[in-house]
Regions:
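Alpha-helical transmembrane segments of multi-pass membrane transporters/permeases
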Residues: 79, 143-170, 181, 292-307, ...
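Transmembrane helix-bundle signature of multi-pass secondary active exporters and lipid flippases
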Residues: 11-63, 232-288, 313-314, 348-355
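Interhelical loop/hinge segments that connect adjacent transmembrane helices in multipass membrane
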Residues: 1-11, 116, 180-188, 193-242, ...
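Small-residue-rich hydrophobic transmembrane alpha-helices
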Residues: 43-94, 137-145, 264-317, 358-366
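Short membrane-interface helical motifs at transmembrane helix boundaries
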Residues: 91-121, 313-343
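Alpha-helical transmembrane segments of multi-pass membrane proteins
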Residues: 113-137, 270, 275, 335-361
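Hydrophobic faces of transmembrane alpha-helices in multi-pass small-molecule transporters and flippases
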Residues: 2-22, 124-128, 154-158, 197, ...
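Hydrophobic alpha-helical transmembrane segments
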Residues: 123-125, 155-170, 174-207, 398-424
Length: 442
């Protein structure tokens, strides 16, 4: 497979991620132009942290669906599994947002100041169906990716951004609602619209490749138990990944200048998400295209190119006036918030490149059904992050610098671990990294 073939398969998925990550800055820009912008921005960061934490077990249904949706029986099985998980996560969201459990989590565990916490609850209540909408559309997107319909995934993100952006602008102009209420409503409008589009866009695959009249695919029959054990490590990996955001916000809430740090962190996080989007699109590309040594080498080369490219882009953004223009003019952040955010971005400079490398290794392991190893790597990442935040917080490091340093160190350690494991399990060759002799297990 040529580099251009990989590029054209990957490009719509990258575009989809870019559009999704652009949603956050659009929402933040609207909040920054409404009353009490610092409080509302801090509350929005916590709402999103909790929402994505609750949805985390279902995020990797995209990888599961891409890897396993091979015929009508497996499609039906994964659909049933997805609906079960969606129902469970909706119940959890209701318990957290509508019961006293909210005070325990937000007030006691996260240590969020009361003036911020009072706005977090209604925002989370509005997002009751967030996990269900995400679950349904990611399941269907996995089907589209498996059958080379990645453009439809990108168009779904266009629909989402149009609905969320249109809703936030309309409500900001036509109502006097608080910023967090407008933001949560806009986010829900976007994900529901995208789920609806995915339901419409997947119909050709249901009539052709996944038609009930088609003979079952070759290989062993997938059972609910098999599906559960395949997805469980991926679900745990997503849980661990998304625990990072509440972990960081909790640490920032306990350090000096908590309100400013919590207001700046969503801006830093959103920019880092946008720049890391090329890496987030890689796992499903690797899962779908891994087929033989030649493809593996071409995917490896493509990964290195993407990692180098986005590292350069991050450096240009952070080290030139572009970052100041974006934070102060586009986002209209207060000067003190923009200054903190720029410092945080500077310290996150190594993160995007390492994210791409880790995404490639995860995709390679998932393609060969070593999902537990992916989970182990993320567990290491979370452990290093937690330990680093605790240590740097004890040393009274500035909040965003401590958070950025912890994230960089954690993903670097995870990268080393995954490199070691793919050499063992998949006999990958890294001449520049000879700390272990490869021992194929397949």
């Amino acid at each position: 497979m040529r580099q251009r073939d990989i590029f054209w398969f990957w490009l719509p998925l990258f575009a989809s991620w870019m559009l999704m990550t652009a949603e956050g800055p659009v929402i933040s820009a609207a909040i920054n132009r409404l009353p009490d912008e610092v409080i509302m921005l801090a509350a929005q960061g916590i709402v999103m942290g909790l929402a994505v934490m609750i949805e985390s077990p279902i995020i990797n249904i995209l990888a599961t669906s891409t890897a396993l949706s091979k015929d009508w029986p497996t499609f039906r099985l994964i659909r049933r599994f997805t609906l079960h998980l969606a129902l469970l996560l909706t119940v959890i969201t209701a318990l957290v947002s509508f019961t006293p459990l909210f005070d325990v989590i937000v007030g006691r565990w996260l240590g969020v100041a009361p003036e911020i916490a009072r706005w977090v609850r209604p925002g989370l209540q509005i997002m009751l169906l967030w996990s269900a909408a995400i679950a349904w559309r990611r399941f269907l997107q996995g089907v589209m990716i498996r059958f080379n319909q990645t453009r439809n995934v990108a168009w779904g993100s266009v629909v989402r951004l149009i609905f969320s952006g249109g809703t936030v602008m309309a409500l900001a102009l036509l109502t006097d609602w608080p910023g967090i209420i407008i933001a949560a409503t806009a986010l829900m409008a976007g994900v529901i619209a995208e789920a609806g589009y995915a339901t419409w866009a997947v119909r050709p695959q249901l009539r052709r490749e996944l038609a009930p009249t088609n003979p079952p695919a070759n290989g062993p029959v997938l059972t609910y138990r098999d599906l559960f054990w395949f997805h469980l490590p991926l679900a745990l990996t997503s849980v661990l990944v998304l625990m990072l955001q509440p972990l960081v916000t909790s640490s920032l809430a306990r350090l000096d200048n908590p309100t400013l740090n919590l207001a700046a962190w969503p801006l830093v996080f959103q920019v880092s998400l946008m720049i890391r989007a090329p890496g987030f699109a890689l796992p499903e590309v690797v899962i779908a295209l891994t087929n033989g040594v030649d493809n593996r080498r071409n995917l490896q080369r493509f990964t290195y190119t993407v990692a180098l490219t986005i590292t350069v882009i991050m450096a240009v953004f952070v080290l030139t006036p572009l970052s100041e223009f974006y934070l102060t003019q586009v986002q209209d952040a207060a000067p003190e918030v923009a200054g903190l955010a720029k410092t945080g971005l500077l310290f996150l400079l190594p993160l995007p490149g390492m994210t791409v490398l880790v995404a490639w290794l995860r995709g390679s392991l998932i393609a060969h059904k070593f999902t537990r190893t992916v989970n182990e790597g993320m567990f290491i990442n979370l452990g290093v992050t937690a330990a680093s935040l605790f240590l740097l917080g004890s040393l009274r490091w500035p909040g965003l610098i401590a958070a950025a340093t912890a994230l960089n160190l954690a993903i670097f350690i995870e990268l080393l671990y995954l490199l070691w494991r793919v050499q063992q399990k998949l006999a990958f060759s890294f001449p520049w990294l000879n700390f272990v002799k490869a021992r194929p297990t397949m």
